């Protein structure tokens, strides 16, 4: 029997294989090692989804479903998939599909044991055009069920916190009612947001929807959103005679989320609950449940209702979401739950990293336009001028983006950005220099010049009777000739590259020493025309 870790790993590889075969499927992005109670980010899998060319720079909408295990989270997400695929194909009112069609998508099944472990996202990111004409990327996220027999409170809190921190809509999946312990668990899971808010002066999370399953009191509050909101107002209402602890729980929820809603769903029917052979066919689901599904899913995913993920007032792109995942997972990989400040620190770090990555792209793309790829050789002076221009453009872009942590915190990332730009510039200079025909023949020219000079010196010293010196010059001529032939073989065959590099370095050193004895004007001409090296960075002088 597979261990939980092995099962999750197999699921992750299976999703990866599905993507390679062109078939969408769930992708494991946060792996739970239950025996060690630790978490691991599957960065490569997450990047393969979020960094696809057509969506990487789109603002992202993340819809997550979280809650206790075996309460039908994946079941609901699969109906969301049906709706999104229906919209992708043009949209029609009967998006629920054929009554005989089994429900597929995120893995789910009946029974008492949990099916999902860690955090999964759907491999296909849906692009949706909002009524205003803006395109957004929609990501569906499934989470491990809370409070199973193998999960600690820390495990549950970590998964819920991660999904809430990275989603724009968190659906809190509950059974039958909103109990007081449900609210207390929610308070525990979102405590980081409440404390971080004291410093950033705004609500850290966006939309929370209580999704009440198997609602049994439609005679008090009708199914759907309207009845749900009336029920929620009553359950979260703060009264003077309530105990302070109960008041704090309710105030905390309102202080953490910008918007809180509730939807009441009826029971899907006995066939769904009791049959071991139920495979999600609509014909086996109660009509009341299907009717409410047709109200719930469009309410969450209708283009006019979609809410982009925001952090610190700035919208997050798919590429930025990857950075936030990487930053957040670090603070949960220790032994203890992080101090609430850690979330603020990690958020600020990811925020600055995303801004730096965007600024770096601006510099790189502009430099590629003038000297990248098949572009012709560019004068080093012009290259440096463009470098300084685009560097300033990138820095201005970085400074303009709203970032958490303050100026002092962001300054470190600005310095790192400048270092990365400097490295890019050096690489562009090398690439540009390789296009200079004089630079290509620098080493053989130096060797040939040395051979000719030593040959003349050998003849002259032999003529005046200095035979020993003449023989020494002849030996040096032979060595240089061997070096020239060796260099030619290395360039032709591609072998012994280290030796070829040593010969190039030696030739460059000789040329540099020779150039140092020539006047400034001659020196500049030699370096620009023969060596093809960029002038020294004016800022470093």
UniProtKB/Swiss-Prot annotation:
The record gives the membrane topology as: Multi-pass membrane protein
Record CDD domains: GBP
Residues annotated for Mg(2+) binding in this entry: 142
Q: Residues in domain GB1/RHD3-type G?
A: 57-305
Residue segments, region N-terminal hypervariable region (HVR): 1-25
Q: Which InterPro entries match?
A: G_GB1_RHD3_dom, Guanylate-bd/ATL_C, Guanylate-bd_C_sf, Guanylate-bd_N, P-loop_NTPase
Q: From the UniProt record, list the reaction(s) this protein catalyses.
A: GTP + H2O = GDP + phosphate + H(+)
The compartments listed are:
Endoplasmic reticulum membrane
For region 3HB (three-helix bundle) domain, the annotated ranges are 343-434
Region called Disordered, residue ranges: 1-22
Q: Name one GO biological process term.
A: cellular response to type II interferon
Gene3D superfamilies named in the record? AHSP, P-loop containing nucleotide triphosphate hydrolases
- Which annotated residues bind GDP? 70-75, 109, 213-214, 272, 275
The enzyme's E.C. designation: 3.6.5.-
Q: Which family does it belong to?
A: Belongs to the TRAFAC class dynamin-like GTPase superfamily. GB1/RHD3 GTPase family. GB1 subfamily.
According to UniProt, the name of this protein is Atlastin-3
Task: Please name the source species.
Answer: Mus musculus (Mouse)
Q: Tell me the lineage of the source organism.
A: Eukaryota, Metazoa, Chordata, Craniata, Vertebrata
Q: Gene for this protein? A: Atl3
């Amino acid at each position: 029997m597979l261990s939980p870790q092995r099962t999750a790993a197999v699921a992750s590889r299976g999703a990866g294989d599905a993507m390679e075969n062109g078939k969408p499927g769930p992708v494991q992005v946060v792996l739970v090692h239950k025996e060690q109670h630790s978490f691991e980010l599957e960065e490569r899998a997450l990047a393969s989804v979020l960094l696809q060319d057509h969506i990487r720079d789109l603002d992202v909408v993340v819809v997550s479903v979280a809650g206790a295990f075996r309460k039908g989270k994946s079941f609901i997400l699969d109906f969301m998939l049906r709706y999104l695929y229906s919209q992708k194909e043009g949209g029609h009112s009967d998006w629920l599909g054929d009554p005989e069609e089994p429900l597929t998508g995120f893995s789910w099944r009946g029974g008492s044991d949990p099916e999902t472990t860690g955090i999964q996202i759907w491999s296909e990111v849906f692009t949706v055009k909002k009524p205003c004409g803006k395109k957004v990327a929609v990501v569906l996220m499934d989470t491990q069920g809370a409070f199973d027999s193998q999960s600690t409170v820390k495990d549950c809190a970590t998964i819920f916190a991660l999904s809430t921190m990275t989603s724009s809509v968190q659906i809190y999946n509950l059974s039958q009612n909103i109990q007081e312990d449900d609210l207390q668990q929610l308070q525990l899971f979102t405590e980081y947001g409440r404390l971080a808010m004291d410093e950033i002066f705004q609500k850290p999370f966006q939309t929370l929807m209580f999704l009440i399953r198997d609602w049994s009191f439609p005679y008090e509050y009708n199914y759907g959103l309207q009845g749900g909101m009336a029920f929620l107002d009553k359950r979260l209402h703060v009264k003077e005679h309530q105990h302070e602890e109960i008041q704090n729980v309710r105030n905390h929820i309102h202080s953490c989320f910008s918007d809180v809603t509730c939807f009441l769903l009826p029971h899907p029917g006995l066939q769904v609950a009791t049959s071991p052979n139920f495979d999600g066919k609509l014909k086996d689901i109660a009509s009341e449940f299907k009717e409410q599904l047709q109200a719930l899913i469009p309410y969450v995913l209708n283009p006019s209702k979609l809410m982009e993920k925001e952090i610190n007032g700035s919208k997050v792109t798919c590429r930025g979401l990857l950075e936030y995942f990487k930053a957040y997972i670090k603070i949960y990989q220790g032994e203890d739950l992080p101090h609430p400040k850690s979330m603020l620190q990690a958020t600020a770090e990811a925020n600055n990293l995303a801004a730096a990555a965007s600024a770096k792209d601006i510099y790189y793309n502009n430099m590629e336009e003038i000297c990248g790829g098949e572009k012709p050789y560019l004068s080093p002076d012009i290259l440096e001028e463009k470098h300084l221009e685009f560097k300033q453009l990138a820095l201005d872009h970085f400074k303009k983006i709203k970032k958490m942590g303050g100026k002092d915190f962001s300054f470190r990332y600005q310095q790192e950005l400048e270092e990365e730009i400097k490295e890019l510039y050096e690489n562009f200079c090398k690439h540009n220099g390789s296009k200079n025909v004089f630079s290509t023949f620098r080493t053989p020219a130096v060797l040939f010049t040395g051979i000719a000079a030593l040959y003349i010196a050998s003849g002259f010293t032999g003529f005046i009777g200095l035979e020993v010196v003449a023989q020494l010059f002849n030996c040096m001529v032979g060595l240089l000739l061997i070096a020239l032939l060796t260099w030619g073989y290395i360039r032709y065959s591609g072998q012994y590259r280290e030796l070829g590099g040593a010969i190039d370095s030696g030739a460059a050193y000789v040329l540099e020493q020779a150039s140092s004895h020539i006047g400034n004007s001659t020196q500049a001409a030699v370096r620009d025309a023969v060596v093809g090296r960029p002038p020294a960075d004016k800022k470093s002088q």
